[in-house]
């Protein structure tokens, strides 16, 4: 029996840039998917969250449109890549909320991959884990995500954010201020629109790159956007500005300038809301209230359309600010919201 802890992730800055090979700045966080498992002839897993057991044989990898597809996807991708593994029997638990924009799917997939790697001695290196988990989500589960989530879950390092160029996969660890916490606010709004709207934005972004003849959004300057049709210009303009903001946050963090980091995050949120059109009134409410209560900055994190937002706050004030916003939020909105105080943490491991 082995026990694996696979973290969720928060993206500090660089939202909706990874599918055009731009810059991102995620971190693994101290909320986890936990998997306890042993070798077995089949796959038998009990999910605490769903309160049910699912099982399948290794020669039946048909999709079931349930949480077990994330597991099947990992077995499928290993088979596709000529790795030989047997089954597992075990239990999935943890404190990482599902559907909250904190990459529970990537956390789960990478956790299953790590479990199989250790049980069957696959000797996978870190980048292979990232690429295999991404392929499983893209090609088996059918979610057209970029590389950000899996990279953060695998490469996370305690006390650091990751500055990642998703084009070259060059990365750099940047220390996060020790006296600052990240307040994560889950709005309770399920992201029903996210899959179709996300796919539309990804399609428009990819078309924009083709029109401009570029391999990455990093190569595009604001002056070139006039070559694009109006909606493409609006959406892709956001991506170009967001790439620049990631570089600005990198520099501000290195200088220890938390105030500047906060301002950039807030600017990013309103650009996401007004020009990329992926916010909602609940996310905007959190950002406005967090700033009024003393946050350095705040923005939605993840795909948007609900899910979660983050605020940078002094560690000593984090819980108070979180409780106050939650109290006001619950008076105004009918959703079951929650808040978490998180810190940059290590990636997947035993």
UniProtKB/Swiss-Prot annotation:
Reaction equation(s) it catalyzes: alpha-D-galactose + ATP = alpha-D-galactose 1-phosphate + ADP + H(+)
Residues that hold Mg(2+) according to the record: 105, 137
Enzyme nomenclature, EC number: 2.7.1.6
Site residues, Transition state stabilizer: 9
Keywords: ATP-binding, Carbohydrate metabolism, Cytoplasm, Galactose metabolism, Kinase, Magnesium, Metal-binding, Nucleotide-binding, Transferase
Residues binding ATP, per UniProt: 47, 99-105
Positions contributing to substrate binding: 15-18, 198
Protein origin, superkingdom: Archaea
The keyword Thylakoid belongs to this UniProt entry's keyword annotation: no
Subcellular location: Cytoplasm
InterPro entries, A to Z: Galactokinase, Galactokinase_bac, Galactokinase_CS, GalKase_N, GHMP_kinase_C_dom, GHMP_kinase_C_sf, GHMP_kinase_N_dom, GHMP_knse_ATP-bd_CS
Pathway stated in the Swiss-Prot or TrEMBL entry: Carbohydrate metabolism; galactose metabolism
Molecular function via GO: ATP binding; galactokinase activity; magnesium ion binding
GO CC, alphabetical: cytosol
NCBIfam families to which the protein is assigned, alphabetical: gal_kin, PRK03817.1
Function of the protein: Catalyzes the transfer of the gamma-phosphate of ATP to D-galactose to form alpha-D-galactose-1-phosphate (Gal-1-P).
Family stated for the protein in its record: Belongs to the GHMP kinase family. GalK subfamily.
Protein name (record): Galactokinase
Organism of this sequence: Pyrococcus horikoshii (strain ATCC 700860 / DSM 12428 / JCM 9974 / NBRC 100139 / OT-3)
